[in-house]
Amino acid sequence: MERSNRKTRIGRVVSNKMDKTIVVAVETKVRHPLYGKIMNRTTKFKAHDENNAANINDKVLIMETRPLSKQKRWRLVEVVEKAK
């Protein structure tokens, strides 16, 4: 699989308490199937952070990768925006 075909997501770091692992919350807008209202749906991904670069509330870009552990299938590409 080429790197260009891998999924990428942008989200906010919710937790960085684990060593070399961050939890990223990704928000998507979904239309309700019956009522049509647009809702925010949040999904949490565990991502590999090799250098422990990301902090809580940072906006980050993550990319899909091979399974690194039981729950980690994503890795940190870059910190898009630092928390204030």
Curated annotation (Swiss-Prot):
GO molecular function, one term: structural constituent of ribosome
Keywords for the protein's UniProt record, in alphabetical order: Ribonucleoprotein, Ribosomal protein, RNA-binding, rRNA-binding
Any Pfam family: Ribosomal_S17
Signal sequence, renumbered to the chain: none
Keyword Ribonucleoprotein among UniProt keywords: yes
InterPro entries: NA-bd_OB-fold, Ribosomal_uS17, Ribosomal_uS17_bact/chlr
GO biological process: translation
GO CC, any one term: ribosome
Domain of life: Bacteria
Its biological purpose: One of the primary rRNA binding proteins, it binds specifically to the 5'-end of 16S ribosomal RNA.
Subunit: Part of the 30S ribosomal subunit.
PANTHER family, A to Z: 40S RIBOSOMAL PROTEIN S11 FAMILY MEMBER (PTHR10744), SMALL RIBOSOMAL SUBUNIT PROTEIN US17M (PTHR10744:SF1)
Similarity comment: Belongs to the universal ribosomal protein uS17 family.
Protein name per UniProt: Small ribosomal subunit protein uS17
Species of the source: Clostridium botulinum (strain Hall / ATCC 3502 / NCTC 13319 / Type A)
